[in-house]
Amino acid sequence: MSLWLEAAVPDVSPDSATELWKTEPQDAGDQGGNTCILREEARMPQSTGGALRIGLESSEPTALLPRAETLPEPTELRPQKRKKGPAPKMLGNELCSVCGDKASAFHYNVLSCEGCKGFFRRSVIKGARYICHSGGHCPMDTYMRRKCQECRLRKCRHAGMREECVLSEEQIRLKKLKRQEEEQAQATSVSPRVSSPPQVLPQLSPEQLGMIEKLVAAQQQCNRRSFSDRLRVTPWPIAPDPQSREARQQRFAHFTELAIVSVQEIVDFAKQLPGFLQLSREDQIALLKTSAIEVMLLETSRRYNPGSESITFLKDFSYNREDFAKAGLQVEFINPIFEFSRSMNELQLNDAEFALLIAISIFSADRPNVQDQLQVERLQHTYVEALHAYVSINHPHDRLMFPRMLMKLVSLRTLSSVHSEQVFALRLQDKKLPPLLSEIWDVHE
């Protein structure tokens, strides 16, 4: 979920945040479960002092997954394109194109073993980034494949493994649900009529299933784009004097820039929600400005690690309660964040359930300054019904799961009030927020 940031400019009017809603819809659903739309422009400023503007603009389509890195001219193996159609019959003595072990079949377009197949799939789903300690030129065999993951992944890509062939766990789950529904529909159509009343089975309509698939694809797109922004975030200070003024300012800048990335995700995800762009520009602004912090907290809870009691942003940055305090946040705000994240973690929600909860939170008709409340309520009802049907299928033996999930949205309203107090406290500490966050949270200097 991300939106784009323009380069720093000298001045930004108080209404600059409203420029973000001149757009045409981006349809992640049309791209399929494994494709998305990315913007390849510099989005993070070098400092938080410059003015930022957010924009909902149409984008050029590219691949969902990050581009494979540019490789030096290979000498040992060149990628071979395989013709479309069924895989050729295996003779039993074929070798893996990556490590030379015994191949089991064609996986992700390449003849490979089960080990390299699983390694490639895990690496793509996790967006893993490995580091070679030998200069990136390790010869790959059954021994070295365990020693150097970077060179192994490079060899997988060079052999021709295609990232777009990898389905995420959530897409696999949705695919199974779709197959189960088709089987149920077929069994219902051919089963003989009986006198007993038919059993009412929870079902997702084709429209609901398609919508959920679109939301999951949009989430993956936005998360990958935000991950690419991590190198532009002000680094966490490692200073001889951690209590120095410079170190405190750097920690605060680090957290505010992470918040900017999160706001980008929210806006970019919202504009891909079916029905959002059909609302008036004023209602789009009102919904996003008031739901932003609640959606940020939902996303934060997804990254909670109960073992270390820490929260990880952009896959590389992990923080505990003490780190939040060092960045200038109050314990009255820190503790509720971690408690909410812990309680959400106990629900063990998947990507589809999180995406639907976020959509329900965004389409809240009782937000201030919403004009067409009836239409917003209708849109929210669509997502509530989809979540109810999905949860009934995904948690058939837990009838309280659906109400527990909706109650989390009530808890978010309380946390939103605590956040307002935190923003006020930052102003008292003379800590200035970047223009984008000031506009989203209505902070007037």
Curated annotation (Swiss-Prot):
GO CC annotation: chromatin; cytoplasm; nucleolus; nucleus; receptor complex; RNA polymerase II transcription regulator complex
Zinc finger (NR C4-type): 96-116, 132-156
ATP-binding is among the record's keywords: no
SMART domains in the cross-refs: HOLI (SM00430), ZnF_C4 (SM00399)
Subcellular location: Nucleus; Cytoplasm
Annotated spans, Transactivation AF-1: 1-94
Expression sites (tissue/organ): In adults it is expressed in spleen, pituitary, lung, liver, and fat. Weaker expression is observed in several other tissues.
Biological process according to GO: apoptotic cell clearance; cell differentiation; cellular response to lipopolysaccharide; cellular response to starvation; cholesterol homeostasis; digestive tract development; hormone-mediated signaling pathway; insulin receptor signaling pathway
Feature: DNA-binding region: 93-168
Alphabetized UniProt keyword annotations: Activator, Cytoplasm, DNA-binding, Metal-binding, Nucleus, Phosphoprotein, Receptor, Transcription, Transcription regulation, Ubl conjugation, Zinc, Zinc-finger
Keyword Metal-binding in record: yes
Region listing for Disordered, in residue ranges: 1-34, 62-86, 178-200
Post-translational modification: Ubiquitinated by UBR5, leading to its degradation: UBR5 specifically recognizes and binds ligand-bound NR1H3 when it is not associated with coactivators (NCOAs). In presence of NCOAs, the UBR5-degron is not accessible, preventing its ubiquitination and degradation.
Endpoints of the signal sequence: none
UniProt-recorded Gene Ontology molecular function terms: chromatin DNA binding; DNA-binding transcription activator activity, RNA polymerase II-specific; DNA-binding transcription factor activity; nuclear receptor activity; nuclear retinoid X receptor binding; nuclear steroid receptor activity; protein-containing complex binding; RNA polymerase II cis-regulatory region sequence-specific DNA binding
Summary of the function given for this chain in its UniProt record: Nuclear receptor that exhibits a ligand-dependent transcriptional activation activity. Interaction with retinoic acid receptor (RXR) shifts RXR from its role as a silent DNA-binding partner to an active ligand-binding subunit in mediating retinoid responses through target genes defined by LXRES. LXRES are DR4-type response elements characterized by direct repeats of two similar hexanuclotide half-sites spaced by four nucleotides. Plays an important role in the regulation of cholesterol homeostasis, regulating cholesterol uptake through MYLIP-dependent ubiquitination of LDLR, VLDLR and LRP8.
Family label: Belongs to the nuclear hormone receptor family. NR1 subfamily.
UniProt-recorded name of the protein: Oxysterols receptor LXR-alpha
Organism of derivation: Rattus norvegicus
